[in-house]
Amino acid sequence: MITTIYHSPLGDISLAATARGLAGLWFRGFDCAPSMCADSARFDMNGGGLIDPDPAATAEEIEGCDALSGAHPMCASSPAHGSAIAVLERSWAWLNAYFAGQAPRWVPPMDFGGDNFEHAVCVALLGVPYGEVVTVDDVAASVASRIGGAPDVCAVRDAASRCPVRVIVPVHRVEGLLTPDDPRECVGVALRALEATC
């Protein structure tokens, strides 16, 4: 696992990737960092190489991704981590386009784990158009069309709120998913406002 910090206009975002895809994306200070990052490696974007791990760190990070300065991630010097770095570069490009007010028509590869139901919820969320807001009931109906049956709305709400890849999987477009006092809802409101102005 490789991680990085992306400096967005709304605050720092941590990203975690495997060779298979993006495994986590969360706003630092608002979302919890996944425990899966404990065995991650650090990559120096400026120097272009892996750095020896700091034994005090629980998750090591790539430095240098910055939406505001236009810095560009460098390629991995280690073939073992090259695929994960490529996933982070695609994620970085997606975030740059998004925060520039564009609606990216592609998503980076995903590797967010979970069961089939959680995957169905994430796929349903990916279908919510840029700038639109839906209800949990709408997401549940979309999930039902994919897996059959009528999923419990509470189960859909729980799966959506646990989605490890926020922003790219637009959890913020689901009205009423989080309570107003949940700090993540502040980020969701800001993301919806960004989409409304573009």
Give the label of every model feature segment.
Residues M1-W106, E175-C198:
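Low-complexity, small/basic-enriched stretches
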Residues Y6, Q102-C198:
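Nucleic acid-binding interface residues in structured DNA/RNA-binding domains
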